[in-house]
Amino acid sequence: MSPAMNSITDTLGTLLPNARKLAGVILKQSRFCFETDGEVLPCAFFVTADGQPSIVGVPELSDETKPSVWAMVAHLRRTHPITAFVSEVWMAKCEKDDMNPDGSVKVMPRDNPNRKEQVMLVLWQGSRQVSFTAEITRNPSHLGDWKVMFDSNFPGEKGMTSLGGAMMEGESYPMEAN
């Protein structure tokens, strides 16, 4: 059975008792960054040995910083029972109006101020991985509901796919942080 719950915090809470608290920190931080700066800055989150949620800011992801960021996340995964990583992902949807009749793009998504993009949250507990995405728009500024993209415990279910595959429509979670 898939992790269909009333909220993303309930889903995260089923993975580890302290995950509800961590989920609140993650969602509040993501919402605060987006409302303040118009973007979601990359961050790593983890639960300490005494069960407290903690946050680590990471540099903006680039070809130069990715190896050190992933090394840090890998270290957190080895040393903490639950780890999460949040970042905007470089993916934008092309609307039908942005396409030429031959299928080529007449307006590149990066040049469209009204483009729709994605924020991704990846959560690990031991060998289990659950990934969520939320759609964002910048004009007007809006951070949408979270959807399950992948759950390693349920790899074959509708709405979930491997990280290497195309994203499929997932289950929706109202944006909340309590």
Residue ranges and their predicted role:
Residues M1-A74:
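N-terminal domain-onset segments
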Residues R78-N178:
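Low-complexity intrinsically disordered segments
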